[in-house]
C-alpha cells in the first residue's frame, strides 16, 4: 500500500471497487432478465467472479480491496485491520453498490419498462420480486428463512477462509498477482454450486445497497421483504458477517497457527515506531 494512501483515498477505492463488481454482476443479471440473454448459472457465476477479480486488481494497492463489509469486519477482528477504518469502509462499499445498481438501471431503463408492460407486472407487487432480483438476492421459494441464513453463513465462511489462505504468502507458494483471479474463481465455484439456493450474496454491501435502490425505484417494501413474513434483507445483511467471522476464526485456529509466519507480523512492523526499531537493534 502506498505511504501516501489516506483514509479518503482508501474509501474512494472501496467505493469504486464495490461499484465495479456490482456493475458487471448486476449488468449480467439485467441482461438475462430483461434483454433476453441466455446465461446459465455457471456463466452468471463466472461473470460475477471475474467482476470481483477486476475490482480487486483496481483497488488492492490502495485499500486492500475488501469490497465487502463482512471481509472488513473479519479482517478487523482477526487480521489487525484498523478499527477506525471499519465504518468508513463499510459506508463506502454500500454507497458504491447503490450507485452501481442505479447506473445499471439507468442504462437498462427502457428494457425494464418494456418488460413490465409486456408481462403486466406491477412494480412493488409480490409478482415483481423476481425482477427486483436483478439488483439483489432472494431465496429459492423452497427454502425457509433459517435455511437461507445457514446457506449464506456457510458459503461466506468458506469464502473468507479461502481468501485468507490465498492471500497468505506463508501458506504454500506465494500467489501474488494470481490471487485476485483465484478469488474470482472461488466466487464462481461457490455461485455455480450454491447460487440457486440464495443467489450467493456473501456480501452485505452487494445486497443492501442495491435493495435500497430498488426500494427507491418503485419496488417499495417488497424489495426488502422479498414477499415473505420475515423481511428477507436481514439474511444477506447479517449472515455473511457471521460467516466471515467463523471462516476467519477457523482459518486462524485450524490452519494459520500451524504456519511458520503470522498474519499480523506485517501490520506489527508497520506500526513499530523508529525509536522502537532502534531499541530492538
Swiss-Prot record:
Residues in the Periplasmic compartment per record: 35-39, 109-143, 195-198, 217-231
Domain-related comment: Aquaporins contain two tandem repeats each containing three membrane-spanning domains and a pore-forming loop with the signature motif Asn-Pro-Ala (NPA).
The protein's role, per its UniProt record: Mediates glycerol diffusion across the cytoplasmic membrane via a pore-type mechanism.
Membrane-crossing residue ranges in chain numbering: 6-34, 40-60, 85-108, 144-169, 178-194, 232-254
Name the record gives this protein: Glycerol uptake facilitator protein
Keyword set includes Ion transport: no
Organism, scientific name: Shigella flexneri
Classification of source organism: Bacteria, Pseudomonadati, Pseudomonadota, Gammaproteobacteria, Enterobacterales
Entry-linked Pfam families: MIP
Oligomeric and partner information: Homotetramer.
Subcellular location: Cell inner membrane
Record site: Substrate discrimination: 48, 200, 206
Gene name per UniProt: glpF
Cytoplasmic side: 1-5, 61-63, 79-84, 170-177, 255-281
Domain of life, per lineage: Bacteria
Catalysed conversion reaction: glycerol(in) = glycerol(out)
